[in-house]
């Protein structure tokens, strides 16, 4: 099942897990992903509680030494470590 926070997706949306270190943008929505160890509803709840809500500003501050995982992301005014696989559930777009 796919869940969107945004009813009007654009072609500018892409997955946070694909972004390089230093990238800045905003959260445009959440989508379900395959292969989670927990139900999608639980993952969605966790991401929302961490601050990955529509319109939140973010920046990738750091990526890990092994396969660039996990990534450190500043979401508004907090810093969060997220696995790249989980970050693929977060749709983002560049700041215009």
Regions inferred by a protein language model and the residue ranges of each:
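Compact, charge-rich alpha-helical regulatory domains located at protein termini
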Residues: 1-48, 53, 59-65, 69-96
């Amino acid at each position: 099942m796919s869940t969107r926070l945004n009813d009007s997706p654009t072609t500018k949306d892409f997955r946070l897990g694909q972004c390089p270190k230093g990238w800045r943008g905003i959260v445009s929505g959440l989508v379900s992903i395959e292969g989670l160890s927990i139900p999608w509803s639980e993952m969605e709840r966790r991401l929302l509680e961490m601050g990955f809500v529509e319109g939140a500003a973010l920046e990738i501050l750091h990526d890990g030494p092994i396969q660039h995982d996990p990534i450190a992301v500043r979401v508004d005014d907090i810093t969060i470590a997220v696995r790249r696989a989980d970050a693929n559930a977060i749709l983002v777009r560049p700041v215009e």
